[in-house]
Amino acid sequence: MQDKTHSPIHVVGGGLAGSEAAWQIAESGVPVILHEMRGVRGTDAHKGDTLAELVCSNSFRSDDATANAVGVIHAEMRLAGSLIIACADKHQVPAGGALAVDRDGFSQAVTDMLENHPLVTVVREEVTGLPPKEWGSTVIATGPLTSPDLAAAVQAETGEDALAFFDAIAPILHRDSINMDICWYQSRYDKVGPGGTGKDYINCPMDEEQYNVFIDALIAGDTVGFKEWEGTPYFDGCLPIEIMAERGRQTLRHGPMKPMGLTNAHNPTVKAYAVVQLRQDNALGTLYNMVGFQTKLKYSVQADVFRMIPGLENAEFARLGGLHRNTYIDSPILLDRSLRLKSRPDLRFAGQITGCEGYVESASVGLLAGRFAAAERKGEAPSLPPATTALGSLLNHITGGHLSSDDEPGKRSFQPMNINFGLFPELEPGSIVKPDGVKRFRGKDKTIMKRQLVAARALKDCAAWLGVERVATEQESDATP
C-alpha cells in the first residue's frame, strides 16, 4: 500500500492563506503542490505574480498582544511558526503601533521561502474546476478574486449561492510631493510601535471650512459604475470614502479623518477640525498611502479631489484607488469544524473565501487548514485550537459561531468578520478584580483589564495547544493586571 504520508497535498491559490497553508504542510514534513494562476492569468486587482501579494493596505494592523485582538492573533501565529508573520516582521516599516510592511519585499520573501522549500512545488496554472478526487486532500484558498470558472464549480457543488462584496484600495502617493510646511509627522497619541518612533504618520490638517468643501467634492465626484454581477453590499470595514461621506457629513471626522491624539507641529495651539493620515508604504519611505481612503471615484476625479487636502495640493500619485470584488461561501452551513467541505471532505477551504476578513485573519485560517490537512495526511486527528484563543475564536465564527434565524424578521446572514474580542468566550466569573487602592473601577479601565485578561488567557492556551513555551515580552509583562 502506498504510504500516503509521502503523497502530496494540493493547495489552490498562492495568496496569504494558500501560502501559509502550503508552508504549514511542508513544515509538517508532508509534500505540497501549490497551484497559482498569476503568471498565467492575472486578476483585476493584482499587479504582479509574486505569492502573497498585498492588494489593499500594507498594514497588518495592531501588533499589541496585550489588549488588541489583532495583536493577539499575530502572537499566536508567531507561536505556530507562521511564514506570513515571519516575513512581515522581517520587512516591517514604521507605522506607530501597527505592523506594516514593505509590500514588495514582503511578498518576494514569501515567494522565495516557498520556492526554496524542498517539500514545496509551485505550479503556475489556473485550476478551472473543482480539484479532481484523484488529488486527494486539497486546500482551496483562492481568495476574494476566485476565477469565474472555479467559483461556478464551487457553487455547483455546494448548491449555495456565492456571496460577494467589495474590497476597496486606497491611493498611494510619492513622499517628495507632500508639502511638509503644512503637514507634520506624528503617530496618534505619539504611540511608538514595532520599528516606530511615535512620528510614523504624515498628518494633513483641515479646518471646518476646508472639511466641508472636501466633503461636498467627495459626494459630487463621479464614481466607476458597477457591473451587473457586482450588485452586492459593501463590507462595512472597507467602505469607500465617498460612501462614508454620503452617510453623514460628520462620519469621516469620527472615522479615518478623526483629529484626536494629534497636535499640529506648525500651529500647536490650534486644533485641527479633521486630519488625513498618510502611512509609510515601502521600506525606503518614498511612498505613503492614504489611510482609510479606499475609493470608487473615477481616476480623473481622484487626483483633483485629493489635491484639495492641505499639503497634497501638488501630490503625485503612484497608484490611484479602486475596488475589486470579494467572493466567499456560506461557511457555517458548508464546512465542518476542520474546514472540510461537508459534501466533499477531501476539500478544505481557507482564507477570505471562508468569510474571514483581513490579511492576518486570512493567513491564520490558511495556517489552520494547512495544519489540519497535514495531520490528516499523517493519520492523525486534526487538533483544533482552544476556543479561548484568537485562532479558535475565528475558526468557531467561520464554522458555526455565526447566528442566523429563518423565522425572525430581517434575519441575520453570514458576513465577513475581522478578529475581535467579541468572538472570544467570556472570562470566568470573578476574573476581573478591582486593583488595590482604586476607588472607582469601571468603564474604560475595566474594559482594558478585561481585554488584557482575555489576551493573556488566549496566549497561554495557545502555547499549551501547540506544546511550546512562550516568554512574555517586556511590554506584556508591564501590562499584566
UniProtKB/Swiss-Prot annotation:
Q: Which domain of life is it from?
A: Bacteria
Report residues binding FAD.
13-18
GO cellular-component term (any) = cytosol
Q: Which residues form the signal peptide?
A: none
Q: Which UniProt keywords apply?
A: Cytoplasm, FAD, Flavoprotein, Methyltransferase, NAD, NADP, Transferase, tRNA processing
Q: Which GO terms describe its biological process?
A: tRNA methylation; tRNA wobble uridine modification
For this UniProt entry, the molecular function terms from Gene Ontology, in alphabetical order, are:
flavin adenine dinucleotide binding; tRNA (uracil(54)-C5)-methyltransferase activity, 5,10-methylenetetrahydrofolate-dependent
Q: What is its EC number?
A: 2.1.1.74
Catalyzed reactions? uridine(54) in tRNA + (6R)-5,10-methylene-5,6,7,8-tetrahydrofolate + NADH + H(+) = 5-methyluridine(54) in tRNA + (6S)-5,6,7,8-tetrahydrofolate + NAD(+); uridine(54) in tRNA + (6R)-5,10-methylene-5,6,7,8-tetrahydrofolate + NADPH + H(+) = 5-methyluridine(54) in tRNA + (6S)-5,6,7,8-tetrahydrofolate + NADP(+)
- Any idea where this protein resides? Cytoplasm
Required cofactor(s): FAD
Q: Write out the function statement from the record.
A: Catalyzes the folate-dependent formation of 5-methyl-uridine at position 54 (M-5-U54) in all tRNAs.
Q: Which family does it belong to?
A: Belongs to the MnmG family. TrmFO subfamily.
**Protein name listed in UniProt:** Methylenetetrahydrofolate--tRNA-(uracil-5-)-methyltransferase TrmFO
Give the originating organism.
Answer: Agrobacterium fabrum (strain C58 / ATCC 33970) (Agrobacterium tumefaciens (strain C58))
